[in-house]
Amino acid sequence: MNNTTEYIDALPLTDIEKAALPKSDIRAVHTALDGEHHPFSRDDDTPLGSVKARLEQAWPDSLAEGQLIKDDEGRTQLQAMPKATRSSMFPDPWRTNPVGRFWDRLRGREVAPRYLSRLTKEQQASEQKWRTVGTIRRYTLLLLTLAQTVVATWYMKTILPYQGWALINPADMFGQDVWVSFMQLLPYILQSGILLLFAVLFCWVSAGFWTALMGFLQLLMGRDKYSISASTVGDEALNPEHRTALIMPICNEDVDRVFAGLRATWESVKATGNAAHFDVYILSDSYNPDICVAEQKAWMELIAEVQGEGQIFYRRRRRRVKRKSGNIDDFCRRWGNQYSYMVVLDADSVMTGECLTGLVRLMEANPNAGIIQSSPKASGMDTLYARCQQFATRVYGPLFTAGLHFWQLGESHYWGHNAIIRVQPFIEHCALAPLPGEGSFAGSILSHDFVEAALMRRAGWGVWIAYDLPGSYEELPPNLLDELKRDRRWCHGNLMNFRLFLVKGMHPVHRAVFLTGVMSYLSAPLWFMFLALSTALQVVHALTEPQYFLQPRQLFPVWPQWRPELAIALFASTMILLFLPKLLSIILIWCKGSKEYGGFCRVTLSLLLEVLFSVLLAPVRMLFHTVFVVSAFLGWEVVWNSPQRDDDSTPWSEAFKRHGSQMLLGLVWAAGMAWLDLRFLFWLAPIVFSLILSPFVSVISSRSTMGLRTKRWKLFLIPEEYSPPQVLVDTDKYLVLNRSRSLDDGFIHAVFNPSFNALATAMATARHRASQVLEIARDRHVEQALNETPEKLNRDRRLVLLSDPITMARLHYRVWSAPERYSSWVNYYSTIKLNPLAIKSK
């Protein structure tokens, strides 16, 4: 077939329009499509002239008037973002030296905060009231936690076998062999370590218990005078002068899911009648060229289908500085001063229009609120693991979120998404400086959300959780290994954040947030050390010959003490602290109605199964988190490349690769304890058998078939599955639609397909002036790329080509005009099938 005829057939035109085009050569086709008759000195630049026509043919409903502009060199450019109005946003250096700060205070250089001056007297009184209440509550929490820990630690001390120093004669230790002395001291050393670790871990569990208990009481009473949601009635008109940007930072995400959720969210906003108060910004940091092209296509389709011209924008950064926080900062610098508020969305976020307008109303009603965090509900996943986790977060999550609000009030958490932020103070106070020094805990901050909340509060602005505001949703990882990959990043980020514990001006609550963030992961190695020391103490106790007579002519032996009744009481108390929040959660559901959870029997059975599941997974997470903490401290780079999975299930090979060492540890541990003391194995059984079963649990729980089966049985049912809100129904509907027209191998199609090449060329960001040096570099890039097979063209080189409109035009022209010369590319493209629904044809 004539390659020119084949090219014309690829254009989304009617047969009559195709017949009108010249079929002599590719240059003639582009010249005919070039309505402005650009004079090009090079044949391979002629596709630049036809970009406008090819775009209008493929996406006529996506292009607003004036959206196709000319750059400084007269090339067609698709204006995907509004005109920038820059603001200055720069970080203050971190001051972590408390001695230097104390010296400044002695010299009178500390400046008292003056943020209350921007509030009216009534607002100042309200602010002071909740701050006083919050302080009293936190001291109460501290007292309850410490008192409980002291009592439990004392009980723990009484049940350990070696009481006091009665089994050691200090006078004999100086005259005997060093090894003998060490073996006499070893049980006491191990017991001291056990007691210390027990105290820390019990304190951590106790804090969670009291948080859940207060949350239970708040939700049971249903009345909270300090809830920020109570500050509005919910139907106030939005101030047209205060506009809101919905920003979604994305990086190599599932394009179909991202744009399905975003479309459902935007249509929900339009249904409220308040769409004029909002704009949407898709801020891409994607570096996979195929995904970059797919994002551009999905953006064009979204604009056409929701009539979002002039309100839905897309930008891909070429320089990915500071990851997600840098992406948000970049938005604030360029467009932030055009908006009063911004709502940060994750790639899997879905929010109703009522929730978004409600957040704006809360900002309007609370002029000293800097961040208001909604409480996102997990939904939308089908694997057994994800459904179990969805159920757990839906049932237990509200207690802990309400409890956090009870203790923290306006000095609360920010989780980085599904939250509204006041833009101006964010620009002024929340830029993040890199952490000084070298090593794994220096450089750009990874977990930016906690730090931004701390900086916002340091500047005097409130950070609230609207825990009772409905309509906010997110998705969870589909399987255990995907969750652990996410935990690895969060672990490193929280360990880095702890360096800010002593930074100047941080509120004590946010210092505690940094501490709890560290403990979320540091508790794993502490628990592992506790188990290891307990095992070592049992080994010493079993293998060491006891010395009952320590003094000459001693009449009565000194026995090691063991009080099993106290051990059982302490164990029962610890289990109550761990599992009572789960019981309170189910009681709350029983009281308020369990129909949406499958009914009384099914929700109760689901709870019991979830408890069993959490017991099986806790030791597995413990070992993984221990590895994450140790690797972070040692500066190890943990590379975790998982294979592609069609249904998000974990292959057996990967499961044994990731869990094999845990399984081996469990087998050795169980065998050793069975040989040493079968009674001690009974206490360790939940730990060792969970490790032995870890590969099997990981694989089985990752399967959608198991999850869908429990869904049919109405187990792990959540309200969003029983009666799905419209925004989630729409998300699923649009996801099916997007999957049916998805674009794979986007970069290759951007080189060959006329429509996708026009889109990539028009959205390319490297808009340089004419330069002989650049021309030489472009020719070199194009020649090097075409002289290799597409498979050998790495990601970075593809990105360089994709970012330059001229290189994309020249690649496009050459592969079509000289297919014999570039046969490796043409043959490769012939093996790739373009989804016929990926682009509309006339």
From Swiss-Prot:
Major localisation: membrane
Please give the GO cellular component terms listed in this UniProt entry.
plasma membrane
Query: InterPro entries per the record?
Result: Glucans_biosynth_gluTrFase_H, Glyco_trans_2-like, Glycosyltr_2/OpgH_subfam, Nucleotide-diphossugar_trans
UniProt membrane topology term: Multi-pass membrane protein
Q: Name one Pfam family in it.
A: Glycos_transf_2
Q: Coiled coil: which residue ranges? A: none
Q: Which positions make up the signal peptide?
A: none
Q: Where in the cell is it found?
A: Cell inner membrane
Q: Which UniProt keywords apply?
A: Cell inner membrane, Cell membrane, Glycosyltransferase, Membrane, Transferase, Transmembrane, Transmembrane helix
MF-aspect GO terms: hexosyltransferase activity
GO BP, sorted A to Z: glucan biosynthetic process
What transmembrane ranges does the database entry give?
A: 141-161, 194-214, 513-533, 570-590, 615-635, 680-700
> Which pathway does this chain act in?
Glycan metabolism; osmoregulated periplasmic glucan (OPG) biosynthesis
Q: What is its EC number?
A: 2.4.1.-
Record function comment: Involved in the biosynthesis of osmoregulated periplasmic glucans (OPGs).
The entry assigns this protein to a family as follows:
Belongs to the glycosyltransferase 2 family. OpgH subfamily.
The entry's protein name is Glucans biosynthesis glucosyltransferase H
Q: Which organism is it from?
A: Enterobacter sp. (strain 638)
Q: Which gene encodes it?
A: mdoH
